[in-house]
């Protein structure tokens, strides 16, 4: 059974990919594959952050008006 990884788990995976690529000891084919995987993770993480931001923007103040947050 496949469960979706948490934001933190996906971020950790992206950080590990970046570290491996920065070290430069990855064969070219693997580096390309890791780069592509990293780009997918990056886009997914960005979507998660944007969704969280939209949720936070809708937080209501005590008087019932929406709290505006700078993007």
Curated annotation (Swiss-Prot):
- What sort of enzyme, by top EC class, is this? hydrolase
Cytoplasm in keyword set: yes
What the entry lists under Pfam families is as follows: Exonuc_VII_S
The record's catalysed reaction(s) read: Exonucleolytic cleavage in either 5'- to 3'- or 3'- to 5'-direction to yield nucleoside 5'-phosphates
Output this protein's name.
Exodeoxyribonuclease 7 small subunit
GO MF annotation terms: exodeoxyribonuclease VII activity
Q: Which InterPro entries match?
A: Exonuc_VII_S (IPR003761), Exonuc_VII_ssu_sf (IPR037004)
Q: What are the protein's UniProt keywords?
A: Cytoplasm, Exonuclease, Hydrolase, Nuclease
The record's PANTHER family line, in alphabetical order, gives: EXODEOXYRIBONUCLEASE 7 SMALL SUBUNIT (PTHR34137:SF1)
Q: What is the stated purpose of this protein?
A: Bidirectionally degrades single-stranded DNA into large acid-insoluble oligonucleotides, which are then degraded further into small acid-soluble oligonucleotides.
Which cell locations does it reside in?
Answer: Cytoplasm
Record has Nuclease as a keyword: yes
| Protein family per UniProt | Belongs to the XseB family.
GO cellular component annotations of the record? cytosol; exodeoxyribonuclease VII complex
A biological process (GO) of this protein is:
DNA catabolic process
């Amino acid at each position: 059974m496949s469960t979706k990884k948490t934001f933190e788990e996906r971020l950790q995976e992206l950080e590990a990919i970046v570290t491996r690529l920065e070290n430069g000891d990855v064969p070219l084919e693997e580096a390309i594959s890791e780069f592509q995987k990293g780009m997918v993770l990056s886009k997914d993480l960005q979507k998660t952050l944007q969704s969280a931001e939209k949720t936070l923007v809708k937080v209501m103040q005590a008087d019932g008006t929406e709290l505006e947050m700078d993007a």
